Amino acid sequence: MKNKIKIRLKSFDHRSLDQATKEIVSAVKRTFANINGPIPLPRKIGRFTVNRSPHVHKKSREQFEIRKHKRLLVIGDPNPAVVDALSKVDLAAGVDVVIELESGE
């Protein structure tokens, strides 16, 4: 039976995302577990166009964009020490973490 832990990290700021990824990787490597990643996933770019003026001047517009950066970490055959190390990692406030446990036969 082969278990895996998949960790998906999302953030609007790539610097805080890379810092969080380094912290998780170093915590897992201290437990001597097998880790694959960080795998950079495609970023999503949302673009918004709004009028600058509230009334007239339709041709005068402003464009904004928001970028969502993502990384994937896969821990193969984790042990209880890995789970304990992951629970003790303190990450930045702007990083969203999704942890999935996948068990295979």
From Swiss-Prot:
Gene3D superfamilies: Ribosomal protein S10 domain. Keywords: Ribonucleoprotein, Ribosomal protein. SMART domains: Ribosomal_S10. Coiled coil: none annotated. It comes from the Bacteria. GO terms for molecular function: structural constituent of ribosome; tRNA binding. It holds the Pfam family Ribosomal_S10. GO terms for cellular component: ribonucleoprotein complex; ribosome. One of its GO terms (biological process) is translation. Involved in the binding of tRNA to the ribosomes. HAMAP family: Ribosomal_uS10. Belongs to the universal ribosomal protein uS10 family. Part of the 30S ribosomal subunit. This is Small ribosomal subunit protein uS10. It comes from Rickettsia massiliae (strain Mtu5).
